[in-house]
Regions:
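Extreme N-terminal starter segment of soluble prokaryotic enzymes
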Residues: 1-4
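ATP/NTP phosphate-donor binding region
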Residues: 12
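Glycine- and acidic-residue-enriched helix-capping/strand-helix junction motifs
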Residues: 15-30
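Generic alpha-helical secondary structure signal
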Residues: 26-29, 33, 55, 84
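Helix-adjacent hinge/juxtasegments
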Residues: 42-91
């Protein structure tokens, strides 16, 4: 498989720093390291992306389309309730 974009949504930078009783101690960096490691085992080229800014996520989705990424995985996190524009970008 070729390039895959993994997007971590709003608030993920606070994992391992806040609400530990709910989300546990793993940080965003540690999550990303696990994902990249697993992808390497599968022979995949993965790019990790995080932003708390909805427009930056939309731009990353469009850029991935233009750069011929084969797949995208999104953990919307804090965007789950306000993602009209992100949903539209994914659909395109």
């Amino acid at each position: 498989m070729g390039k895959v974009l993994v997007i971590q949504g709003a608030g993920m930078n606070m994992r391992g720093k806040a609400q530990l009783e709910t989300f546990g101690p793993m940080t965003l960096g540690e999550m990303n390291e696990q994902i990249v490691g697993y992808a390497e085992e599968l022979g995949m080229d993965v790019e990790m992306f995080h932003s708390n800014i909805e427009g930056e996520v939309i731009n990353a989705l469009y850029a991935a389309h233009d750069d011929d990424y084969e797949a995208g995985i999104i953990n919307p996190a804090g965007y789950t309730t306000t993602t009209g524009p992100i949903k539209a970008a994914i659909a395109q």
